[in-house]
Curated annotation (Swiss-Prot):
Belongs to the UreE family. Residues 145-156 have a biased composition (Basic and acidic residues). Its main location: cytoplasm. InterPro entries: UreE, UreE_C_dom, UreE_N, UreE_N_sf. GO terms for cellular component: cytoplasm. It comes from Rhodobacter capsulatus. The gene is ureE. Keywords: Chaperone, Cytoplasm, Nickel, Nickel insertion. This is Urease accessory protein UreE.
Length: 156
């Protein structure tokens, strides 16, 4: 029986070099605390972080033996949205939907309900397989977690 190496730290993008391997994770899989993962080479390792972490592409898992496993954003189904981006971004944000904002397009996770809404607002929408890197949450959480604002938030 072989020993599974453990990663208990994540190094920030730009703060390391010399990855021994890499792993491509989609948006959901990049939100974790403890999980067994398999790197591109087939090597298994256990992620065992102190708290739930929102991983970003370019970061690295630091294995206990000193090796680094680079985190890459994996391909996943997204909607590429173009048109009046300010207006369209407002509607996407109003639904608390994670969104990757670029100068000439928005990317959201593939969702037929949002696709119908956006087309109804005049957007051009195309389905694609791309890495999804949405904006971090406004309050530092790194994730849009639905409509719950906590116990002291009320709508007027």
């Amino acid at each position: 029986m072989s020993l599974m190496h453990r990663a208990s730290r994540v190094l920030p993008a730009g703060g390391w070099s010399g990855a021994a391997d890499h792993i491509a994770l989609d948006y959901e899989a990049r939100f974790l605390r403890r999980k067994r993962l398999v790197a591109a080479s087939g090597a298994e390792f256990l992620v065992d972080l102190p708290e739930v972490t929102n991983l970003r592409g370019g970061e690295a898992f630091a294995l206990e033996d000193g090796r680094l496993i680079e985190v890459r954003c994996g391909l996943e189904p997204v909607l590429v949205v173009t048109g009046d981006l300010t207006r369209l971004a407002w509607h996407v944000g109003n639904r608390h939907t994670p969104c990757q904002i670029e100068p000439d397009r928005l990317l959201i996770r593939d969702d037929h309900v949002l696709e119908t809404m956006l087309r109804g607002l005049g957007a051009r929408v195309e389905r694609r397989m791309e890495p999804f890197r949405p904006e971090s949450g406004a309050y530092g959480s790194g994730r849009t977690m639905g409509h719950d604002h906590g116990p002291f938030h009320v709508h007027a």
